[in-house]
Amino acid sequence: MPLARHLAGELGITWTDLWNVGRGELEPESKASGNQHAGILPPVENVHQPGDGWVDCACGRKHWGTNGASGILLARRDPVSGKVTHVVMQHRAAWSAEGGTWGIPGGATADGESPIEGALRESYEEANITPEDIEVVGSYREDHGPWAYTTVFAFEKPGHTVEPKANDDESMEICWVPIDDVPNRKLLTAMKTDWPRFAARLDELACAGHR
């Protein structure tokens, strides 16, 4: 599976940026009409893994991931105060759905994986986030019925250093972003909606872990 993911990256294929796109966006027959960067198209070739595929959602949209999808919201804490100082964010490829916006690393959940396992795998393959360097502390599941997206909350472990980087063409950049700067970024629509809730939850989890 990591090999397939690597090959997909070399081809510039994406699946993490497809989980929240509207009906027809980036589908072969409607790339030009569904993508604001219509002149920047992904390669025709594609590499699939079990779990890749479109789901017709009850919300009236199509989402990527037959088993749902998930991503890691990784935070760094001040070693003295315990407060959250940074989070890892993904600057999405220009040709992708909502290209040029910022979100979190993640993607479709493979057959046999839990959402957390899928998020850990995707974040390692896509963003160089090694599971050994982080601590999973919670999750939030947005459930649409036939499809769901799970945001996994995690902290960089004390004494460990995560050095995120873009491992494939799905991202222009993956980096640590100061927590106060997140709202100033051009966020993915779903992230813009959820960010106030996510930021508050990270603060709660950080305080609980620092007691």
Describe the predicted segments one by one:
Residues M1-G12, G24-T101, G107-H160, A206-R211:
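N-terminal leader/linker segments that precede catalytic domains of diphosphate-processing enzymes
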Residues E163-R201:
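NUDIX/MutT-family hydrolases
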